[in-house]
Amino acid sequence: MNKKILETLEFDKVKALFEPHLLTEQGLEQLRQLAPTAKADKIKQAFAEMKEMQALFVEQPHFTILSTKEIAGVCKRLEMGADLNIEEFLLLKRVLLTSRELQSFYANLENVSLEELALWFEKLHDFPQLQGNLQAFNDAGFIENFASEELARIRRKIHDSESQVRDVLQDLLKQKAQMLTEGIVASRNGRQVLPVKNTYRNKIAGVVHDISASGNTVYIEPREVVKLSEEIASLRADERYEMLRILQEISERVRPHAAEIANDAWIIGHLDLIRAKVRFIQERQAVVPQLSENQEIQLLHVCHPLVKNAVANDVYFGQDLTAIVITGPNTGGKTIMLKTLGLTQVMAQSGLPILADKGSRVGIFEEIFADIGDEQSIEQSLSTFSSHMTNIVDILGKVNQHSLLLLDELGAGTDPQEGAALAMAILEDLRLRQIKTMATTHYPELKAYGIETAFVQNASMEFDTATLRPTYRFMQGVPGRSNAFEIAKRLGLSEVIVGDASQQIDQDNDVNRIIEQLEEQTLESRKRLDNIREVEQENLKMNRALKKLYNELNREKETELNKAREQAAEIVDMALSESDQILKNLHSKSQLKPHEIIEAKAKLKKLAPEKVDLSKNKVLQKAKKKRAPKVGDDIVVLSYGQRGTLTSQLKDGRWEAQVGLIKMTLEEKEFDLVQAQQEKPVKKKQVNVVKRTSGRGPQARLDLRGKRYEEAMNELDTFIDQALLNNMAQVDIIHGIGTGVIREGVTKYLQRNKHVKSFGYAPQNAGGSGATIVTFKG
């Protein structure tokens, strides 16, 4: 887009409004380079980035970015083979730190869906080794001792030598106190010296470095410290050389990544600029507009960003509308309206938010041209009319259907009749070429043109006749009218004179009356529209409040659920811990019978939470209510899925049952009755597939391959219980070889179990060390 329009509309001043919100020099540079584009994809991307950043601020209202300096020149020097100094390394260090902070922020971000911004966050590089290398430089511009072993060694020697010098000088201060003008150690030419009285200068051997202005004091470096000082000077030179070597070495390490670091700095600046745009939105109640690709413009309550206390106005430039002609007197805000339209378009096409209400739409124009203000060329000695016409002629040769044209006081500066005719002819040419134009004029002849011509609309700026002041409110569809008679009357002009004047232009008065009626209708419509907007705003506020309340309730609900889960988990952990202790006690009592161990385990398992199908529970409860159990009934033990028979009922309401070879004591809720006519096998609680063979009597096999350790141990425990209930003499456990963790767990479990007679690996042809055969006690 041409630079002249940006200067005319003062776009640089608008961009300056965003500068206070920037934190990085990279962001500032990108802001200054910002210019409007006609590429829809670029504009859409900028709009999407702002919307995502707004959503990010909702979840992270204090999101910030560490300040960084421009490093483009530093990276360029690296690529050219130059070595960096400490200050330049500190700039790179800051960029790497900022990049790492942003990556960490993005990794921990929750409840926000990002697409466009995610691309930038994910393009940031991570250089942990380089960050470690750059830690050698502290923020004070000092190379740390750990930068190299040699540097640390040299500095230790310097420290030791300086300590020796101090000790020697302190001793001399005490010994030669009467020969000194002051009891202090002074410094001259980088050397430690004593302030000796001139009369004793020959009493202290050493090098004279200075004499006081009075000649009474001679600054002598004692011979005892001269050699040490020379050693220190030599060590200082070694230190400087080693620091240069470190700078060269780290420069070589950073050099291959110069382009990536420069790119990271650009991304940091880009994120900073997006953040600044959203901060501007929050500060100025700006919006991200919708984008119309058919040049339709709809601006709701739009304001000029550079005008203090600007009046908000609505502008609608439909797809078929080619021209809006603003008529009426000067000083009413017509020029500001032109600039507001143009500047809003420039801001939007530059990817910036606009000062308008939600629902506003902007078009896309390849060029925006303007002839605004007095651009008279003094050098060419042209008149105002000639200057404007020269500019318009140039513009007419450049505009096309993809342009927006802004014309201020079209046809002014010449004979009113000829000026009006020229203005209409120019507007007609633009209309036929379908070029969107907003023009201002004070010629009344253009009112008729706006009324009679298709795709052209009149507009005006409201004037308050009561206060004799413009209101700066834009009235689209209503042509401007003359207020001369009303103003003259209010200023005290005789009513006779005003009446005589009005009779001379009765026809114009009729037009003014029509315009006045249109103004009243427009004002009434505007009031209704404002009321509707107020209701919409209230609804929006209510919706936001409800949404916020809903989210807060959900968060509170989730928090309470998490607390409940944690408390439940603590209870379960305590119960399981108690159960482990009970089991240890049970196992330690070898006289207990197998069925007593199994019954105890079944009760302990009830302590652990288990997912329950409530609907099935209701069905089971209804089924139980159909008939009370009695002695001799067949039952299914719910804990194991085993069938048995009720043998007797105890006084406390519990039942004794024969389950296989084991007698068990059960509560009524722990079993289900089996219908006498039901011949189908009861569906057991599935633990693992049990395979029976007829080779050595009843056998079972448990396959633990592919299981997690905890899952495998739980299944093993249940499987052994079932084997004991079924009175099995021997079972096979397949655990595989793998890492050996499950195999070791199986071995430890079997060693602890008092009912295991023996166990060992299967024969080689039956699984070898990948399977264990277990034999139970008789």
Swiss-Prot record:
GO molecular function terms noted in the UniProt entry: ATP binding; ATP hydrolysis activity; ATP-dependent DNA damage sensor activity; endonuclease activity; mismatched DNA binding; ribosomal large subunit binding; rRNA binding
Keyword set includes Transport: no
Keyword DNA-binding belongs to the record: yes
Domain Smr: 702-777
EC number(s) reported in the record: 3.1.-.-, 3.6.4.-
One Pfam family this sequence matches: Smr
SMART domains per UniProt: MUTSac, MUTSd, SMR
UniProt binding sites for ATP: 328-335
Top-level EC class as recorded in UniProt: hydrolase
Any single biological process term in GO: negative regulation of DNA recombination
Swiss-Prot/TrEMBL keywords: ATP-binding, DNA-binding, Endonuclease, Hydrolase, Nuclease, Nucleotide-binding, RNA-binding, rRNA-binding
Record SUPFAM superfamilies: DNA repair protein MutS, domain III (SSF48334), P-loop containing nucleoside triphosphate hydrolases (SSF52540), SMR domain-like (SSF160443)
Protein family: Belongs to the DNA mismatch repair MutS family. MutS2 subfamily.
The protein's role, per its UniProt record: Endonuclease that is involved in the suppression of homologous recombination and thus may have a key role in the control of bacterial genetic diversity.
HAMAP family associated with the record: MutS2
Listed name of the protein: Endonuclease MutS2
Organism: Streptococcus pneumoniae (strain CGSP14)
Taxon lineage: Bacteria, Bacillati, Bacillota, Bacilli, Lactobacillales
Gene name of the encoded protein: mutS2
